[in-house]
């Protein structure tokens, strides 16, 4: 068992978890965000989104200054007080966005895979795809270590594409709405472990960890947490963990921020 009073880190996915998949509403989670902030419990956002997008969301959610995990773990935005850490303000894993883009353009040109990346379109098109404002959509294009795309080919071709990327040291990952290409060495789990180790080094004690996510791409993150909340997903398969001991893993009945709140209620309110 654990409590909100002990050293604790909360790691949370965004779309479909803390944010509603369509409206991006987070208000159902607001009371718990306030309570965690008052208790000095860091809420560390983890997403496929760019660091620029997530810094904007951090401010909106009242979480500014905390570390975050962007681009599925390929980018770690460091906490404001970690200025002495090499790489401040961000640590980037693997090859850059530009290098990945070159690989994808070559595969598309020579092997005729069909897909559209966020680099292929303008912010107005992304706003139409996502429901974001144009200014927010522009932030989605500021990738540093990954590429976001829409797959427009067959499942058979996708398998071939994935294999080619793997040969080149890259991975192909499904998100809530889009697909993402990033370095094979990057991941939300590795990034989370690095952040946990940093907090442990600074405080002298390993914090207890709670993670929340809704999709298969969140499973690696949840696997390295002490406690996990699998938020009910909308029209997609939820994550599956190797060990779903009910004492440590809770599957919600509600979706999005309602499920996020349900998960916090389950692990804290009953204790």
Curated annotation (Swiss-Prot):
Originating organism: Escherichia coli O81 (strain ED1a)
HAMAP family: MPGP_rel
Alphabetized SUPFAM superfamilies for the sequence: HAD-like
Record-given protein name: Mannosyl-3-phosphoglycerate phosphatase
GO MF annotations, alphabetized: magnesium ion binding; mannosyl-3-phosphoglycerate phosphatase activity
Domain of life according to the entry: Bacteria
Annotated catalytic residues: 13 (nucleophile)
Xref: InterPro entries: HAD-like_sf, HAD-SF-IIB-MPGP, HAD-SF_hydro_IIB, HAD_sf, MPG_Pase
Gene Ontology CC terms: cytosol
A UniProt-annotated Pfam family: Hydrolase_3
Subcellular location(s) of the protein: Cytoplasm
NCBIfam families recorded: HAD-SF-IIB, HAD-SF-IIB-MPGP, MPGP_rel, PRK03669.1
Family: Belongs to the HAD-like hydrolase superfamily. MPGP family.
GO BP terms: mannosylglycerate biosynthetic process
Lineage, broadest ranks: Bacteria, Pseudomonadati, Pseudomonadota, Gammaproteobacteria, Enterobacterales
Keywords: Cytoplasm, Hydrolase, Magnesium, Metal-binding
EC id: 3.1.3.70
Obligatory cofactor(s): Mg(2+)
Catalytic activity: 2-O-(alpha-D-mannosyl)-3-phosphoglycerate + H2O = (2R)-2-O-(alpha-D-mannosyl)-glycerate + phosphate
Binding site for Mg(2+): 13, 15, 214
């Amino acid at each position: 068992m654990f409590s909100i009073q002990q050293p604790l880190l909360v790691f949370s996915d965004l779309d479909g978890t803390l944010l509603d998949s369509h409206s991006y509403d987070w208000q159902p989670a607001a009371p718990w965000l306030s309570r965690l902030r008052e208790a000095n419990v860091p809420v560390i956002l983890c997403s496929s989104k760019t660091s620029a997008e997530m810094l904007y969301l951090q401010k909106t959610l009242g979480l500014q200054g905390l570390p975050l995990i962007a681009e599925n773990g390929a980018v770690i935005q460091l906490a404001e007080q970690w200025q002495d850490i090499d790489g401040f303000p961000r640590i980037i894993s693997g090859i850059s966005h530009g290098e990945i883009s070159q690989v994808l353009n070559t595969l598309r040109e020579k092997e005729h895979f069909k897909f559209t990346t966020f680099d292929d379109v303008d912010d107005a098109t992304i706003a139409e795809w996502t429901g974001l404002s144009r200014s927010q959509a522009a932030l989605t294009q500021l990738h540093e270590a990954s590429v976001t795309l829409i797959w427009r080919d067959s499942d058979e071709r996708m398998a071939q594409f994935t294999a080619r990327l793997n040969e080149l040291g890259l991975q192909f990952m499904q998100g809530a709405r889009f697909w993402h290409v990033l370095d094979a060495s990057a991941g939300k789990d590795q990034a989370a472990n690095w952040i946990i180790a940093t907090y442990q080094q600074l405080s002298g004690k390993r914090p207890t960890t709670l993670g929340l996510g809704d999709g298969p791409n969140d499973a690696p993150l949840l696997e390295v947490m002490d406690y996990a909340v699998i938020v009910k997903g909308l029209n997609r398969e939820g994550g599956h963990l190797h060990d779903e001991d009910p004492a440590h893993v809770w599957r919600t009945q509600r979706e999005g921020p309602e499920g996020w709140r349900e998960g916090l209620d389950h692990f804290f309110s009953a204790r």
